From Swiss-Prot:
Gene: aphA
Record-given protein name: Aminoglycoside 3'-phosphotransferase
Keywords: Antibiotic resistance, ATP-binding, Kinase, Nucleotide-binding, Plasmid, Transferase
Enzyme Commission (EC) number: 2.7.1.95
Gene3D superfamilies according to UniProt: 3.90.1200.10, Phosphorylase Kinase, domain 1
Species of provenance: Enterococcus faecalis (Streptococcus faecalis)
Length: 264
């Protein structure tokens, strides 16, 4: 804790907690679990290079405050900008991570049901006063900034096997040229079983909300399709997912949004 760039006020708030660094996440944010006698908290930190991007925890703070009463999200306890860092202190989400509660091989139908429940929840939210719009224009402008400042995920070895591009700029050019029409709804922006909490068989919480906001309805759906294929692996469960949603898949959009995520 001594090496953290935090204010005296924040240090006082967390001094009685045992600090454990999270090593699971893939984002550039630093995340710490703060273990207390009666409760656990989380501290999430991003440096100034990410200010204004979807990685910026100030953006996540704004969305968490806006989502209060709309979705089950952690409570914002403290936010600050200090010594070149943005620091967000929040409560622990209620329930257990979906990825820990349900094994992909043992409970595939339940996981599909939860994904469909999430999509229905998101699409029911009124976005008229949502503070952020993650339209393709804004995401591609962000991606251009990240690429120009060596902040994008450019490890091509981690790309999907069928991604037909040689380098990040070639993929970026394709994404910019082939933008689909958008139908804006509320979107989580990074939906998967490691960002969903469950309790008594129902969705009980969401975390990692920095990319949430207005976005095309197929954005989160594409993430669900990718997760189902990678984690469960049987196409019948993709079909079940769309049956539960009561819609037909738009495969062009699904492919596009999976490609977009290759660089984040």
């Amino acid at each position: 804790m001594a090496k953290m760039r935090i204010s005296p006020e924040l240090k006082k708030l967390i001094e009685k907690y045992r600090c454990v660094k999270d090593t699971e996440g893939m984002s550039p944010a630093k995340v710490y679990k703060l273990v207390g006698e009666n409760e656990n908290l989380y501290l999430k930190m991003t440096d100034s290079r990410y200010k204004g991007t979807t990685y910026d925890v100030e953006r996540e703070k704004d969305m968490m405050l806006w989502l209060e009463g709309k979705l089950p999200v952690p409570k914002v306890l403290h936010f600050e900008r200090h010594d070149g860092w943005s620091n967000l202190l929040m409560s622990e989400a209620d329930g257990v991570l979906c990825s820990e509660e349900y094994e992909d091989e043992q409970s595939p139908e339940k996981i599909i049901e939860l994904y469909a429940e999430c999509i229905r929840l998101f699409h029911s939210i009124d976005i008229s006063d949502c503070p952020y719009t993650n339209s393709l224009d804004s995401r591609l402008a962000e991606l251009d900034y990240l690429l120009n400042n060596d902040l994008a995920d450019v490890d091509c070895e981690n790309w999907e096997e069928d991604t037909p591009f040689k380098d990040p700029r070639e993929l970026y050019d394709f994404l910019k040229t082939e933008k689909p029409e958008e139908e804006l709804v509320f979107s989580h922006g990074d939906l998967g079983d490691s960002n969903i909490f469950v309790k008594d068989g129902k969705v009980s919480g969401f975390i990692d909300l920095g990319r949430s906001g207005r976005a095309d309805k197929w954005y989160d759906i594409a993430f669900c399709v990718r997760s189902i294929r990678e984690d469960i692996g049987e196409e019948q469960y993709v079909e079940l997912f769309f049956d539960l949603l009561g819609i037909k898949p738009d495969w062009e959009k699904i492919k596009y949004y999976i490609l977009l995520d290759e660089l984040f």
